[in-house]
């Protein structure tokens, strides 16, 4: 469970639980079998990638971070009751930075999102300004071992990502790991404006993840250059997430 506000100086004032979700609920879905891998990044090296009205979110150590996050998405609905046809269950892998806006909302800024569902790509690119890419993807699990594999089809055909992990024991997240995983929305750019797309979910149940193989081209292709050692990897069986009504940031 996440630490309460005030238990760590590094998290003082940080929203470790989601604020009230603006209604109506736009999407409802499950994220499962998810792995978090993170590297530190100098904030000034990525500041130019952020849309107007946002900037790199910086932890108490003076660094921002880039994440490689593969998982499986399922049970996507419009609102809370209407399943979206032709979507079903499919793997995704996202590369994300961490953002904050002038209203103090801490979110993520996606640099890319790999998906095996072609129909998702134009809908999210046009409708939400989220940079989805169409990829050939596989996710294989055998007991405590999971392999995530993707090969980009469009755009920038051929980009690859391969990750194999072994799931370990339950862990108590550090303040930095809370800061990285307790994110209640995404900043996007659409139609010349910056948007906040809010979400809510319960705290991530987190386990250690031992990396057996990591061969990734997506981080480099995103234009982000890590500046230090990789953090410990984390695995989660998943959460149920809801997205609320987007609002304009600037």
How should these model regions be labeled?
Residues 1-2:
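Short, small-residue-biased leader/transition segments that mark boundaries at the very start
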Residues 32-38:
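Short amphipathic
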Residues 19-30:
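A short, surface-exposed helix-loop junction/capping segment
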